[in-house]
């Protein structure tokens, strides 16, 4: 899928925590959120990330108030910039430990879509894109890594 001129790449990733965020078994994940988010913010190609009052998104409850549902939403200049962050930084190690902290999702949990440069998506907008991907599969409206032929790093890690 070609990137439209004047657009950036938005992504939403959701997951259900195995335990409450305050549970000691979640400490390695929760205690490193600021570190990993800070790393993302310093990466070439990073544009923006959603934050709630916690400074991350750990307190956002978009799914019927479920305290164990977590979201991550960000905007990047392009798919390559996002892929380099996800697969070529310490983030990859945390992704590799995801089963320690997150339940296995039965359905899609990751979506990407193009946004006009300068647009900051809302959580509701992102959830609507994820729902669209679930219902209709990849399209110009909502897609996954397979729709970005230039971004190949995900193939070795089997993301989304």
What is each of the regions a protein language model found here?
Residues 1-69, 108-160:
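Short S/T/G/P-rich N-terminal loop/turn motif that feeds into the first structured element of a domain
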Residues 79-107:
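An amphipathic, aromatic/His-enriched active-site/gating alpha helix that lines ligand/cofactor pockets
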Residues 60-87:
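Helix-adjacent hinge/juxtasegments
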Residues 32-36, 71, 81, 94-97:
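Short, hydrophobic/aromatic alpha-helical segments in well-folded domains
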